[in-house]
């Protein structure tokens, strides 16, 4: 091997190694060893006053990673003529940003300018799951914060009306597999959905059916009572499953029973491969948790274009 080829090989090995090592659970071991603990405390405190916080943080993290990668861009406020992601239509109902603000404030007091807002959100999402009775995991850290946040880009988020082909494409564009899709959909075990997210299944479903025939009839009737065709009740909707504050596999059990809310949930039963995974997770909470952790680490490692550590998560430096 000549010297030129050897040097090229060294460069390639270095670049690949750098990418692999870019995120690490030990990233703050020496610069801010208490980072995880500080974020956990902020989430715990918020949860003691508001049981909707875990679902909010988990959803916030998903929405961050699916637009520009996991760079904390969903946390930025709109400014001037720029309408930020958090004010895009799919994100209007996002809340609990104050939890990230509180964690950031505490971290800045202990480790000024060290921990990124993107990492704080990733840690908070992990804590949201763990503190709701779900699994915990070592979060790879080292993300940088992005400087761009545009509401129009929230169109890239998977919609609750997506079919399985649209979901496959949407997740695939982010390097996520169908296994990841089914596992991450289990995050719907936490939280609440507004009527607008599933009205399409209850009223004028298609030219032949008024209501989606895959819905359990009694379940559909209950939803119609909450979400009539001309609903005027602000924030009307339904819990995502029967144990809204517990992270478990009830979501999959309800899905099999025809009691899911979103068309995108029901679409997981449309093809044999994903239907098999739904059944697997419905039958074993342990299998679900194992798959969820693996897919969460994968999703939260989607690289963004961030290059700074914000001092305030709502605005760039």
Swiss-Prot record:
It is found in: Secreted. Ca(2+) 2 binds at residues 189, 241, 243, 248. Its main location: secreted. Expressed in the whole plant, but preferentially in roots. Induction: Pathogen and elicitor-induced. Up-regulated transiently by a cold treatment. Pfam families: peroxidase. PANTHER family: PEROXIDASE 25-RELATED. This is Peroxidase 64. The gene is PER64.
